Amino acid sequence: MQAGKPILYSYFRSSCSWRVRIALALKGIDYEIVPINLIKDGGQQFTEEFQTLNPMKQVPALKIDGITIVQSLAIMEYLEETRPIPRLLPQDPQKRAIVRMISDLIASGIQPLQNLSVLKQVGQENQMQWAQKVITSGFNALEKILQSTAGKYCVGDEVSMADVCLVPQVANAERFKVDLSPYPTISHINKELLALEVFQVSHPRRQPDTPAELRT
């Protein structure tokens, strides 16, 4: 494996980037951030330099161990395989499948439908309504699932990849003014997780590229 700090290409508000920041913090991995502003200058993800890292023109991208990995779940799977302690995935195969199911529900079934590229397509005047619709649809399903899987967190009482995906998506829901009162399980788990240091240090309000007016 290559020596030197991993480098994370991240945007402070990107929920996918936040997932990876949480995972890196959880595993105690020291890393450097290279901010990629998805809005400034038409989007820095479209530069030729960044496209050599990720032809999909998306964040996050992680340089680690001599390779570059994109897609947040793939990054977390790699971290789990190479640095397994503390765990993001339970040892029990059934619990592990449930964690992956919840993670994929959020990462494939909710977030992509309300990401920046989709919102641009629906038009400025329709963005809030569209985001609320798709997040609500996903949360209706997620709440039912979590009612049967949750302990203190999404799957039992240990933080997992599912939790790493949940918190950034709840932040998206809040940003789009989704009514969270129908989702008490989601809301309770989110509150418990936000009390943990790894979720705080990785928070969008505490990143190098966070605008001054949004910092806490």
Curated annotation (Swiss-Prot):
Domain GST C-terminal: 92-212
Pathway: Amino-acid degradation; L-phenylalanine degradation; acetoacetate and fumarate from L-phenylalanine: step 5/6
One GO location term (cellular component): mitochondrion
UniProt-annotated binding residues for glutathione: S14, S15, C16, S17, W18, R19, Q45, V59, Q71, S72, Q111, N115, L116, S117
UniProt cofactor(s): glutathione
Details of cofactor binding: Glutathione is required for the MAAI activity.
GO BP: any one term: tyrosine catabolic process
A Pfam short name: GST_C_3
Residues with Phosphothreonine modification: T136
Modified residues (N-acetylmethionine): M1
Subcellular localization: Cytoplasm
Family stated for the protein in its record: Belongs to the GST superfamily. Zeta family.
Assembly: Homodimer.
Entry-linked NCBIfam families: maiA (TIGR01262)
Name of the molecule in the record: Maleylacetoacetate isomerase
Originating species: Mus musculus (Mouse)
Gene that this sequence comes from: Gstz1
